[in-house]
UniProtKB/Swiss-Prot annotation:
Protein name as annotated: Catalase B
Record's signal peptide: 1-15
EC number: 1.11.1.6
Organism annotation: Aspergillus oryzae (strain ATCC 42149 / RIB 40)
Active site per the UniProt annotation: 101, 174
Entry keyword Metal-binding: yes
GO molecular function: catalase activity; heme binding; metal ion binding
A family per Pfam: Catalase-rel
Quaternary structure, from the entry: Homotetramer.
SMART domains associated with the record: Catalase
Residue numbers binding heme: 388
Gene behind this protein: catB
Amino acid sequence: MRALSLASLIGIASAACPYMTGELERRDTGTDDATAATEEFLSQYYMADNDTFLTSDVGGPIEDQNSLQVGDRGPTLLEDFIFRQKIQRFDHERVPERAVHARGVGAHGVFTSYGDYSNITAASFLGAEGKETPVFVRFSTVAGSRGSSDLARDVHGFATRFYTDEGNFDIVGNNIPVFFIQDAILFPDLIHAVKPRGDNEIPQAATAHDSAWDFFSQQPSSLHTLLWAMSGHGIPRSLRHVDGFGIHTFRFVTDNGDSKLVKFHWKSLQGKASMVWEEAQQVSGKNPDFMRQDLFEAIEAGRYPEWELGVQIMDEEDQLKFGFDLFDPTKIVPEEYVPITKLGKMTLNRNPRNYFAETEQVMFQPGHIVRGVDFTEDPLLQGRLFSYLDTQLNRHGGPNFEQLPINQPRVPVHNNNRDGAGQMFIPLNPNAYSPNTLNKGSPKQANQTVGKGFFTAPGRESTGRFTRAVSPSFEDVWSQPRLFYNSLTPAEQQFVVDAIRFENSNVKSSVVRNNVIIQLNRVSNDLARRVARAIGVEEPEADPTYYHNNKTTDVGTFGQKLKKLDGLKVGFLASVETPASIEAASELSKQLSEDGVDVVVVAERLSDGVDQTYSGSDAIQFDAVIVAPGAEGLFSTFSFTAPSNATSSSTLFPAGRPLQIVIDGFRFGKPVGAVGSAATALKNAGIQTSRDGVYVDKSVTSGFVDGIKDGLRTFKFLDRFKLDH
């Protein structure tokens, strides 16, 4: 259907707004169904083309398959407005991609407050138990272009918009709680360093090159975030399996003006899970859309991912209490110091209807805050408040990007901003200034006591001389990277070591590699020596200035069982030559589906009961691999000298593919198993059936399936990965 007129939309919004009826003091308790409210709002802008004739942009029916020309072979006429419109619109379809976070995927959902938190914040969306607020979330990678791989090793953006009844509130965060720099003035330097080279645009979406590690080694404030990115956090299993963080310290402010310092946390209710590096590289090559596909399919299947929102709450006097500055964005507050207070739950339950109109055009910025939330003096946050707004002028060609449907608040907008490119509304107030008498003083000023307006925390104050210098309270940038490294399991430490080795093996400058080891040695001599011996740098003596043995909790991505199995996939490797192998999948699927696990049946070719072929399958597509009974003939040890008709060789799939799926599944730490006679396939793969995470049974029994479920919850069996010592 055609979109409603903008004038009618203004009327609809005005009629529904409590502020327009004089109920300025009432605090709305929220909609009964925030999901329905999202659909109701966005559906006003839908354009459906069902059973219609093609029209021009101005509504006239047309045909556009042939240009208007002179005769059968003559030139195209300039008067062909249909041709000109079609080509011109095509030429201008793209907008400039984001300078960072260009590659992203989004979803709608709802946030439900666990209670009334007016004792800590005046924010309306946290003002009542059960109150629902529509949300939109965009996940992203940072460095790559819009067409880059989802599985590039990177920090992942986790930006959330709350469409509250007092305006839009954005938490523009990441899946890592700290950032590379302390001062926003360094942001162009950071991004120029990690982006591809200026002369050849290589490498794409990667930091395994000289300029990135040159910057990291010259700007040691980056070390903390760097170690997080080199761990499993840089290559998550899916976006459903990441936590999120607001990075900065913010303020909560009550109606009375009392303020607290807070840090925002999103905790995945699926649990955390990550890939290993070679697995992620293979995914990048085989399916660069892996992350967005996983999120989209989970929501389409009704397996809605969920996160809990929590905050660490600190007194204003605690700014330097913990041995570091709470306004330093390269620091975490360990949860042993300040536990997380849970505020509510977010459920993502609706995919966008149009990627460009919603996910690409959405603009988040830290300056989207509401009454009850306030900023701090964090210098990175202060700079982001300008940058995120400014960049949208370039992307959208004017200041009216807030009027796009995905960016519009769900409450009416009344101010004196006017005109600009792409103005979508028709303002009726001719007196666009304040104060005025000609429009009876409207729109009126709203503040802490009148109109439920935004207000700055009354206690904020700042004095001092002008200076360009790093605060002494920001200077220790090595203790917390060590805290992170100390807190990882030995296998996770090995993954970090291996990742830094890989990255620096691609660094050509020996000077840069030496500088990297100098900085790593200030964090950990163990880490520095293990990396140095692999990249041609002399192993250093300890530099213990910042060494300590402290540890914290919940910073890794391995070692904790998953909370849900929703959307995980088990590859069931069968053969069309043995129908019983395909039939065995039904019982497995029946039992695993109770936990939301999908069984994908793989065979030589498509037929009834077969989901995909060996030619299109790899271990990277599955979270567990099981060989079906009767299919073991496909898993004989591959040999190039074997007869051409050997069962391990076929024109239907690459040589040795079935056996390789089993081998890769095991070496990537996944649960693997076999039913009945198929146990020989594990033997051919060199897998001992006594190992943890290996499951064998005569049939698909409940005990066998329970073992697979437990293996999926473990997700990665870390004893399969070799340690340096």
